[in-house]
């Protein structure tokens, strides 16, 4: 599958995103609030076929590559706009975020034929994985529960070295504690 950027998208088995966001909200009107904040997030993508393609490293053809993970650990800043619908019962958040990835690694686990020992290759080459990410998030919430959609504007890979790009759009459920 080809992305709008023209770069192939790696086959993603699954992924997860864990985030802790601290924000200070202000409510100047009954229908509107805004805030600023900071966050820590961890993202993991379980990939399939990237290592076998030889983009990261040339593996022997007979190597059994059974796990591939792309891991990011980020700290970032946020600007949040909140629109209250039906009083405080339902709200829509529009959030801009900017991240710096202090952890950027690609892990590959494989076994050579005739061996019972698995090998882990961990690539932390900063020139391959870009440290800055930015995007927008929209979430609809009631009480502490929110459904969100997040779009990342920036690339995760240096496309001159790794011509791939993971999904830019993600969706999920968030819990907010006040």
Language-model regions, residue ranges each:
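Structural signature of outer-membrane beta-barrel domains
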Residues: 1, 41-47, 99-103, 150-156, ...
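Extracellular/periplasm-exposed beta-strand and loop segments of Gram-negative cell-envelope proteins
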Residues: 2-13, 43-72, 101-114, 118-137
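Residues that define the transmembrane beta-barrel architecture of outer-membrane proteins
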Residues: 10-18, 30-32, 71-75, 130-134, ...
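Residues on the lipid-exposed face of transmembrane beta-strands in outer-membrane beta-barrel proteins
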Residues: 18-26, 38-42, 77-83, 94-100, ...
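Short loop/turn motifs that connect adjacent beta-strands in outer-membrane beta-barrel proteins
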Residues: 25-34, 85-90
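Early exported N-terminus immediately downstream of N-terminal targeting peptides
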Residues: 29-49
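Membrane-proximal helix-loop-helix units in multi-pass membrane proteins
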Residues: 83-111
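Predominantly the C-terminal beta-signal and adjacent terminal strand-loop region
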Residues: 122-178
């Amino acid at each position: 599958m080809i992305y709008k950027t023209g770069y192939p998208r790696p086959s993603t088995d699954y992924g997860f995103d864990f985030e802790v966001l601290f924000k200070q909200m202000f409510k100047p009107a009954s229908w509107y609030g805004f805030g600023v904040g900071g966050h820590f997030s961890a993202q993991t993508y379980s990939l399939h076929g990237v290592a076998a393609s030889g983009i990261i490293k040339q593996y022997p053809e007979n190597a059994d590559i059974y796990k591939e993970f792309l891991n990011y650990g980020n700290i970032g800043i946020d600007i949040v706009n909140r629109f209250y619908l039906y009083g405080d019962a339902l709200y829509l958040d529009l959030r801009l975020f900017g991240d710096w990835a202090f952890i950027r690694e690609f892990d590959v686990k494989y076994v050579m034929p005739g061996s019972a020992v698995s090998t882990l290759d961990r690539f932390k080459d900063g020139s391959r994985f870009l440290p800055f990410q930015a995007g927008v998030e929209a979430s609809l919430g009631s009480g502490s529960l929110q459904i969100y959609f997040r779009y990342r504007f920036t690339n995760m890979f240096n496309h001159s070295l790794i011509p791939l790009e993971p999904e830019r759009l993600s969706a999920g459920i968030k819990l907010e504690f006040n």
